[in-house]
Amino acid sequence: MSKYLITVLNANMTQKACPHRNAPPPGVNVYTKDNYSIYEIDGEKNKLYAQNLCLFAKLFLDTKSVFYDVTTFLYYLLVAHNPTPDIPITGLGEDGIGQQEQVVGFFSKEKMSWDNNNLACILVFPPWQKQGLGQILMGASYEMSKREGRLGGPEKRMHFQVLQRLPY
């Protein structure tokens, strides 16, 4: 199967046949509370998934520059259980009901940051923006960095609008 799909028909056929469409993201579930989980994905171990995630993010972030060389990054996906809004087109189960879990955003960070950065990219996908999910992602980034003894800040090249909203 090709990495990129040319037609909508191919995309629909792939979506229906894809064995991963109702599975949780690859990687390790590092946090679960209430209606949310955070999965850690290693860009080296799950290269294609990370590349596709970054290419998808590029649709919404003008400043997104890394989307092929993903092996030096860790990705943290925010997964909502029974999300609002539920977008059933993104994955219908066998019974035609929308999937119960949805990736709603993510952040990434370098595995080895010489500048002690704890955040390289952060994005809440448009249907789920303005629900405070960005704060969950930033809080998770901060807490992980604190536990690692690596208190730094975001990359300096982050978009100005994102920097305005950072609480630390």
Each predicted region: which residue ranges?
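Non-catalytic substrate-recognition and accessory regions of acyl/acetyltransferase enzymes
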Residues: M1-Q129, E143-E155, Y168
